């Protein structure tokens, strides 16, 4: 009994030390990488010359790669972590990709950055407006031309119809900047992290997912057109740490990450005017919902297999 108690206490102490180390490491890496990116972003703003813009953008992408390497060290603080990754074949840093993914946790961004950093161009995320105010990180993301999306409720849009379509315009402006060099645009199309509360509030018909929001990726496809080489449909989960994967990651208790990558061609019928063409909008939503149904079945299979193993 005493041995079990001592083991429990030591495990808690080790988790607390790992948590502290992880937080300090994350802050230091973020500051070290974001400050040069912010300075470069200011240079890009003051000198909007195409040649300078391209060189500065490449430098910013390099610093983001360094940030991803720092996050990889963070994952190494999880000594029992096992990766199960399927579908990385055929990827290239010379291509343009649209990456869509389910969203379970803050850990998702760390996983995507670390996993894909050597396989595809640097990820550019669709971000919530609130993240713009996070010290260092917000300005760095702005310098990297990541679009900040401001979500409005249906009731708010009814009172302020002039706000309708603002996110779409933000997407269009950001995507125009990605034409000049290979880019991976990442969109968590659920618009928010999955929780049971949000699942009930949105009346989701999916078991493991929130309903997908189609406007952002539809606009990205419309602006960049055939410049996108492929669609990366990514499904990820943390079967052993499903309740709080990000906290478990920081505490060194993350044990298993499962990632399925489905590389798909982008059909011509997915390019169109999502805002004004109701027929296209309906077709696009049906296509995205069908992807989400497949993703939901895959997640159910992964989670049920884990329960059986236990």
Curated annotation (Swiss-Prot):
Q: Describe the inactivation phenotype.
A: The amount of cis-vaccenoyl group (18:1) linked to the sn-2 position significantly decreases in the deletion mutant. Loss of the gene does not affect cell growth or morphology, but leads to increased fliC expression, enhanced flagellar formation and enhanced swimming motility in the liquid medium.
Gene Ontology CC annotation, any one:
plasma membrane
Q: Kindly give the membrane topology term recorded for this protein.
A: Single-pass membrane protein
What InterPro entries does the annotation carry? Plipid/glycerol_acylTrfase (IPR002123)
- Periplasmic compartment spans: 1-20
Enzyme class, one word?
transferase
- What's the further remark here? Overexpression of the gene in E.coli carrying a temperature-sensitive mutation in plsC allows its growth at non-permissive temperatures.
Of which family is this protein a member?
Belongs to the 1-acyl-sn-glycerol-3-phosphate acyltransferase family.
Name assigned to this protein: 1-acylglycerol-3-phosphate O-acyltransferase YihG
Organismal lineage: Bacteria, Pseudomonadati, Pseudomonadota, Gammaproteobacteria, Enterobacterales
Q: Which gene produces this protein?
A: yihG
């Amino acid at each position: 009994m005493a041995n079990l108690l001592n083991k429990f206490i030591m495990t808690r102490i080790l988790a607390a030390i790992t948590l502290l180390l992880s937080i300090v490491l994350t802050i230091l890496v973020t500051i070290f990488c974001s400050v040069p990116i912010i300075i470069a972003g200011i240079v890009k703003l003051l000198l909007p010359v195409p040649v300078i813009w391209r060189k500065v953008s490449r430098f910013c992408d390099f610093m983001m790669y360094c940030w991803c390497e720092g996050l990889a060290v963070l994952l190494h603080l999880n000594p029992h972590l096992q990766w199960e990754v399927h579908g990385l074949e055929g990827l290239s840093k010379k291509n343009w990709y649209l990456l869509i993914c389910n969203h379970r946790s803050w850990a998702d961004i760390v996983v995507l950055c670390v996993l894909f950093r050597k396989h595809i161009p640097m990820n550019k995320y669709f971000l919530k407006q609130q993240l713009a105010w996070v010290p260092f990180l917000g300005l760095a993301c702005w310098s990297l031309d990541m679009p900040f999306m401001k979500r409005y409720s249906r009731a708010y849009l009814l009172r302020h119809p002039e706000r309708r379509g603002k996110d779409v315009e933000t997407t269009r402006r950001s995507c125009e900047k990605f034409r000049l060099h290979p880019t991976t645009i990442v969109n968590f199309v659920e618009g928010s992290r999955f929780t049971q509360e949000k699942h009930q509030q949105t009346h989701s018909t999916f078991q493991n997912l929130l309903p997908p929001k189609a406007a952002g990726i539809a606009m990205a496809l419309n602006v960049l057109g055939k410049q996108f080489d492929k669609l990366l449909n990514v499904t990820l989960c943390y079967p052993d740490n499903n309740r709080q994967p990000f906290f478990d990651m920081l505490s060194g208790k993350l044990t298993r990450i499962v990632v399925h990558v489905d590389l798909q061609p982008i059909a011509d019928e997915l390019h169109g005017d999502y805002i004004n063409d109701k027929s296209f909008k309906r077709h696009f939503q049906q296509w995205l919902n069908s992807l989400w149904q497949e993703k939901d079945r895959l997640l159910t299979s992964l989670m049920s297999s884990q329960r059986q193993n236990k």
